[in-house]
Amino acid sequence: MELIEKHVSFGGWQNMYRHYSQSLKCEMNVGVYLPPKAANEKLPVLYWLSGLTCNEQNFITKSGMQRYAAEHNIIVVAPDTSPRGSHVADADRYDLGQGAGFYLNATQAPWNEHYKMYDYIRNELPDLVMHHFPATAKKSISGHSMGGLGALVLALRNPDEYVSVSAFSPIVSPSQVPWGQQAFAAYLAENKDAWLDYDPVSLISQGQRVAEIMVDQGLSDDFYAEQLRTPNLEKICQEMNIKTLIRYHEGYDHSYYFVSSFIGEHIAYHANKLNMR
């Protein structure tokens, strides 16, 4: 991995790296925050997945997470949201193509050549992190919007690999809302069974489980009713007896003003779970 940026932050280092991804067949950037204690010992890792139109910079520059990661001794890894490059398929819209990888493995041309974000996040990136950084094998996952969807899917499908999962404003029923339906139709065609493999509510209804799910949702979020549908997740978790910490916040929208208001609590939540394991 090539170091391309380095900034001291809260006694640790907010670094940016570039590497060639075998899964995605392109160069990828990834942000890695190393707390002060990483200079002398191995630490657990929190993976953060960002939302539509974002790249690896949004979370590390807007959330203020470095303060809390330093306090709780957690390495934070923030990858990009899709493969990138002039040779990578794209679309003339914000919710498909580059910046909108949906953390799945595409099966349809032209997307299937590069869009293997599920494999990248689950397998390739953790292997790189373990090889290049002072990381323990313990890891948790979180994300925002499309990234919250990705975090929930990865945790539900791989419950033994992630100690804990949380999300801000996640797309919980993508197979039932425009964002998910449009992306799934392009990436996965009309194979509705494949769609359900990337739908948190469907996965839970099929019996996939995690110990607990933490979600924060703003009630002034313009996408809440049409695209996100957090109550669907709350309902299925109640039916399947999955413990949840789902909080609704008056006045908060879909932006990083919302994420930055509660990211400290999410990092503390993951730190507690990681230290218990």
From Swiss-Prot:
Active site positions: S145 (charge relay system), D221 (charge relay system), H254 (charge relay system)
GO MF term list: carboxylic ester hydrolase activity; S-formylglutathione hydrolase activity
Domain of life: Bacteria
Keyword Hydrolase: yes
Upregulation: Induced by formaldehyde and repressed by FrmR.
One GO CC annotation: cytosol
Family matches, as InterPro entries: AB_hydrolase_fold (IPR029058), Esterase-like (IPR000801), S-formylglutathione_hydrol (IPR014186)
BP GO annotations: formaldehyde catabolic process; formaldehyde metabolic process
EC number assigned by the record: 3.1.2.12
Regulation: Inhibited by the sulfhydryl inhibitors (N-ethylmaleimide, iodoacetate, ZnCl(2) and CuCl(2)).
Catalysed conversion reaction: S-formylglutathione + H2O = formate + glutathione + H(+)
One Pfam match: Esterase
Uppermost EC category: hydrolase
Function of the molecule: Serine hydrolase involved in the detoxification of formaldehyde. Hydrolyzes S-formylglutathione to glutathione and formate. Also shows esterase activity against two pNP-esters (pNP-acetate and pNP-propionate), alpha-naphthyl acetate and lactoylglutathione.
Family the entry assigns: Belongs to the esterase D family.
Name of this chain's protein: S-formylglutathione hydrolase FrmB
Source organism (scientific name): Escherichia coli (strain K12)
Lineage: Bacteria, Pseudomonadati, Pseudomonadota, Gammaproteobacteria, Enterobacterales
